[in-house]
Amino acid sequence: MPSPIGHALGGIAAGWGSVPRRNVAAAVMLAAVAIVPDLDLLIHDHRGVSHSVGAALIAGAVTWVVTRSSRWALAVTLAWASHVLLDWMSNDARPPLGVMALWPFTRDYYKSSIEVFPAVSRRYWLAQFWIDNLRAVAVEVLILAPITALVVWWRRPAGAQGSSRGQP
C-alpha cells in the first residue's frame, strides 16, 4: 500500500480540477482527504469499508451537506477514491489481499493484477525498514509527482496562464 506521501499526491491530482479555489489550502485539504481512509489502521480493520467507492461517495455527500458546494463534494469524492485506486494497484502481501473497493454492493476484496506501487512496511523493527520504505516512497514520487504537477499546471488560474500564451 502506498505511503501518506503517495496518497497525498494522488488526492491532489484527482481532486484539483474540481476545487472552486485552487490554492495551498485546497491542496492541503485534498491531501488530507486522500490520507483519511488509512485511519482504519487505528482500529485494525485496514482496507475494509473505508477503502471503497461507497466510502468515497459518503465523504462527498457529507462534504456537500456541510459546504453546499458540488465542486468541493466532487473534489473530496475524487481525492478519497484516489486512495482506493492507489491501494488497489499496490503490492499487498497481508491478508485479506486487496481492498473492499465495491462496498456497499459487495464485501469482496479486489486487487489489481498489475502492482504499480511497492508495499510500505510498518515493521519498523526490521533492518530493511528504512531502505524498503525510502524505495517505495521514491517510486510513488517518481510516478505521482509528475502527474500531480501536470494537473496543477493544466488547471492553474486563468491569470497565471498569460505568460505561457505569449502575453506580457
State where each predicted segment sits.
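N-terminal membrane-targeting hydrophobic helices
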Residues: 1-168
